[in-house]
Amino acid sequence: MRAGDETETSIMRPQYPGDDIRPTSKKELAGWYSYGWAAEVFTVCAMGSFLPITLEQMARDRGVLLSDKVTPCSATLNGPSKTSTQAQWTLSSRYYAGGPTVVSQCVVYIFGVEINTASFAMYTFSVSVFIQAILIISMSGAADHGSHRKLLLVAFAVIGSVSTMLFLGVVPKIYMVGAVIAIIANTCFGASFVLLNSFLPLLVRHHPSVLRGAREPPPALDGSRAQEGHSDTTNDIDHGVESNATSPLLHAHQGNSENAEADMHPATPITVSQELKLSTRISSFGIGIGYIGAIILQIVCILVVIATNQTTFSLRLVLFLIGLWWFIFTIPAALWLRSRPGPPFTTTHQGKHTRSWIGYMAYAWKSLYRTAVRTRHLKDILLFLAAWLLLSDGIATVSGTAVLFAKTQLNMQPAALGLINVIAMVAGVLGAFSWGSVSRVFNLSASQTIIACILLFELVPLYGLLGFIPAVKSLGFLGLQQPWEMFPLGIVYGLVMGGLSSYCRSFFGELIPPGNEAAFYALYAITDKGSSIFGPAIVGIITDRYGEIRPAFVFLAILIFLPLPLMLLVDVERGKRDALALAAELQPSGAQTYGTLPANEDRAPPSEL
């Protein structure tokens, strides 16, 4: 160990056996960013573009027309490798009755049940989300306790990436195998990202800029020290990856180690604000890196599809490339991320089967119940999760509704829809990197920045509703009457996604009781993924009722607006104090706590659990 590292580790004392108290290094941050670069391509390029198309196309190759339930949807059923996506579009477009060209509906029979091929991918996604939720809950105990956090992250990454690569061998005759592989891949992706998110509060808590700020004199009343600390944080994040990745972020400091523990987390609003800003910047940088990787691979995949004549094999080939990208760039994360073991089970949980995987799973489900009970007494986490439930549902529903609207009512071709996806991703990168500057220019807090994103997001359904106004409708454009209007809305959607993805994740991390990261991020992920089934279902009902999608914009406008009053009620300072108090209360008698409680020693602990 380097001399500098030895000095650094003396600043803090281990709080439990195996506690990794080393300051966050540049190499460790690079490993965290690397996994975002590796895995974000799956959700953007696979789930957002090629995976649904591949599943639908393979089911279509084995399906029949809904209109007569006899005519095969594919004219080259026995030669799936020669089935051109463009040819399928042309063939299917022959069957429509007046008005704009609409792709004909095809059905397949699975265990005797008639299923629309367009719904096949959606059902596959729903099943994967259900399994994903169970898996996330079950593995949270092993992630929070012991040294399994990194092991699980790497394991899920390998299984998910290899599963995605296996699409290369899936042909339409075994399209159900493709559905199973998609379920495995999406489940592993979601679980791995929950584990990645659980590293974020730990990286922030041990970040040198936080430790440095904790050792310096209290801030002046004019906030000059807070501004200086913020500047240091900015410098560390902006140059952390570019500098020598093998060295610690912070060089050695002199200090009295006996008083270090009391100094590590001084409970002042300035420290809380500094950690939140740092968490937001790391999260934003990670999201931005992930989007950049997704854009690069998306362009490569589009070129591959064109070069291979847009066949069904082309779609399977790009899924292989997505899985290969995911696998290769997981390697730096596996090498550079530290395990950061969590606290061991307390004596009340230690038994013969405690350390077995069954014991971890049983403990995890009990912990979920306890987490839900504790959340009821953490007002700000409860408010935020309620807002996030609605907001994430709105994000997922707007994305799917917009694509469906563009296809069926604006008659946009697949290439144009792919271009919208690229534009949205570019805007997402800009959003991830620019919202921090916007918040500084306008002096916005993290919650206020999230609120600004919600207000901007609200413009999307409101713009679609303009099409109901007779004066606008008579113009023939505006209010989503022309295909080109989807492109600026894609920019708005991307900017909003870049901001919400980074700010919401880091904002929630500041409200989590230390030592319970994986459990609470599991709740965060379940709230995120579990909500996505409701919005699309309601949009489907509205569409069936009125015969078109545009009336669903009313529902979307309401859905996006509802999180706004909830976010206005969230107080991050109060939430941080409650989280630290709860963490201290949950520790067994005489154990070290994860940080220092607020200076107000007379403050009562949270309500009885």
Curated annotation (Swiss-Prot):
Listed InterPro entries:
Atg22, Atg22-like, ATG22/LtaA_families, MFS_trans_sf
Against Gene3D superfamilies, the record matches this protein to: MFS general substrate transporter like domains (1.20.1250.20)
Question: Which cysteines in this chain are paired by disulphide bridges?
Answer: none
Give the stretches traversing the membrane: 95-115, 117-137, 151-171, 176-196, 287-307, 317-337, 381-401, 415-435, 450-470, 487-509, 522-542, 552-572
User: Which key words are in the record?
Assistant: Amino-acid transport, Autophagy, Glycoprotein, Membrane, Transmembrane, Transmembrane helix, Transport, Vacuole
Q: Does the keyword Transmembrane helix apply?
A: yes
User: Superkingdom, according to UniProt?
Assistant: Eukaryota
- Indicate what this protein is called per its UniProt record: Autophagy-related protein 22-1
